[in-house]
Amino acid sequence: MVQSLSQLQGPVSNMSFIIGRAVAKARGKLAFSQGRGLSGLAFDKYPFLARLGLKEDNLGCWNGKEWVGNGVSHTAKNPATGESVASVKFGDVNDYETCLANMEEAEESWMMTPAPVRGDIVRQIGLKLRDHKDDLGALISLEMGKIKSEGLGEVQEFIDMADLACGMSRQLPGQVLPSEREEHAMLECWNPLGKIGIISAFNFPCAVHGWNTSVNLICGNTQIWKGASSSSLVSIAQTKLIAEVIQDNNKNGGIATLCQGPGSSVGQTLIDDERLKLISFTGSSSIGKTVASSVSGRFGRTILELGGNNAVIVMDDADIEVALSSVLFAAAGTAGQRCTTLRRLVLHEKIYDKFVNSLVSAYKVTSVTKTTLSLTTNMQMC
């Protein structure tokens, strides 16, 4: 027989809640004003922000030609401390329209660029990310709240995807088929879709964008990206790096645009825009259903990466120490904020009490600090 951990009452019945409660407790013990300048922002505490081209005051829309921001103001915060780090002036619907106009301008020339050349530009984006990996990983940790090693892992995912896409650019398929007409053959050739919209979530502000962008660009599409509002600095920093590579190759900046803004205005406009042939959305299942319905209603295409309801089943013959370490990180990794987070733990009755006691002990040594969540990996069964 097996028992579900969700049957328990107490601190281990909801693993994500434990982390959230610990974060809230830690926030209450921190002095938010420490390290702030005259602006009231903690920007100067983090030198890597300036190295990524960020400022205390940032514009949130790259239309392919210039940085603009005519929408509402947003304050980027460190979720581990609550301190304000920098400000962002969001784009509005008019800024969005400028992005689309510049994408239209860039579309034909990018489409006609040979796929291996597009792939080489994506490869260069990967190289640029390598040069700024440590700073960008630190920014992801700062703005999203995950540990720095996970932030670095996100950047590496983008780098790996850029490498993969570069190779794929030389393997885009096509066929030569026989024809019933003499001295004729039929050639199959895949064409770019055109303009693409990307909406990414706060919990993986770099990797998800990287997966989409790497493949999208080698296929010859132009794109507009709306990252999550709470990770706007990551979106701006990444876009600056990509725009620099595109400019170095004398290509039109409208290939890859960014418009940070509220989901209710910029996001909804993007979803409803018939000029965007495909929408890639990462977020909750409930919002994903709405996106799918809206886009399919205009005969558009969608790529949806939504929520999960994940379980671990541990039998009595399992390697318990490995299972314990895996369960803790599955529940607490990424501060518990991901679609693959562990929600249900099912244990064989023979190991149930021992495993639960060990898991409670493991949570007691899991520390929440100002900027990182440290997970203890050297754990023993009680």
Place the predicted regions along the sequence by residue:
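Glycine-rich loop-to-alpha-helix module at the N-terminal edge of alpha/beta enzyme cores
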Residues: 83-172, 183, 362
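Rossmann-like NAD(P) dinucleotide-binding subdomain of oxidoreductase/dehydrogenase enzymes
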Residues: 174-322
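Terminal low-complexity tails and localization/encapsulation signals of metabolic enzymes
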Residues: 2-87, 120, 124, 172-200, ...
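Residue-level signal for inorganic ion chemistry
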Residues: 82, 118, 140, 162, ...
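Short linear capping/connector segments at secondary-structure termini
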Residues: 139-147, 177-182, 373-380
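Proline-centered turn/helix-capping motifs that create local helix->coil transitions or kinks
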Residues: 163-178, 247, 365-371
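Short, well-ordered beta-strand elements within core beta-sheets of diverse protein domains
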Residues: 84-91, 106-112, 198, 312-315, ...
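ALDH superfamily catalytic-core signature
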Residues: 241-244, 286-382
